[in-house]
Amino acid sequence: MGSLYELTREELAASLTGEPRFRVEQLWRGLWREDRRVDEVTTLPTALRERLALEHPSSLTAINEVVSDGGATTKWVFALHDGATIETVLMAYEDRVTVCVSSQAGCAMGCSFCATGQAGFTRQLSVGEVIEQVVVAARAGAPRRLSNVVFMGMGEPLANYDVTVGVLRRLHEERRMSARHLTVSTVGVAPAIERLAREGLPLTLAVSLHSANDEVRNDLAPINRRYDLARLAAACSRWIKETGRRLSFEWALIDGVNDTERALDELAAYARPLAAHVNLIPLNPTPGYLVRGSTPERVRAFRDGLIARGVNATVRNTRGRSIDAACGQLASVTRGKPGLRRDGSTTTVALRTRPL
């Protein structure tokens, strides 16, 4: 049988046939409100806990856990029941605690600068496999409360649409997380954006844009050959109209590719009619894409240029680069030894070993 997090409340009740009805609420509270492992739900009899743990083992087995940024960023590599692997990242800020979850093992989108896309697609994740990433992160972040969940890990969330929406609804309804603190990132699956707009969830949508020029974007994000910038803009406009929510564009700044004055003008012209906020991300290094990221000076100049052109823009505070946990770096492999960079130089990374 699968993880308990695969089950709805009704399915959970069915698994407790023969038990008093109040056991369902005790178990549900332990799992969804208190983030406990089933063996830790001490309101249940020991024999029942042992049976449930045996029948519904965890979906995730941690095979590596590394910490950076002075303990503020944690990355896990998890093995799934069939040997597929995924990565999850927990980031603690002064004002929030965020987990970045994977929605697929690998990714079929093939974005040239993304380590996940370079690695290829393995399979879709299930609802329970995604939710357990959230629960593991919530336990690790305690006593601080997990406040935000972002679908910015491995995979294209809207290519695993039903699971993504199922997870969003359960986080909102069962964990009582504000939908505004749930973010879905997409490379631009236009029909799915329009479908998501009709779900009635006032979540945050982040579009990985990276170029407002079809020719350039075709190379950076091959999905653009199927849904070009005009089609994507129409979907974004529908999103805004249906939800009343602002959207954001993610833009990984690549030296000489999308940090030029022309790229600046193209982005401003594209973002302004949609009143989109632009998150600028200095390109993070990956083994399969050897072009450099923009210099800090160019990043600041690009941001200032957008603001001068009437576009809201900020530079993302990059976390986890030293442990390959930053945007575009997730590839579900343990590269080198913990505590070392790929080139052998030391970094402030420490292994943790604690039960999940």
Give the predicted meaning of each segment:
Residues 137-314:
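Conserved AdoMet/S-adenosylmethionine-binding subsite of the radical SAM
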Residues 1-86, 92, 237-246, 253-356:
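Auxiliary Fe-S-binding modules of radical SAM enzymes
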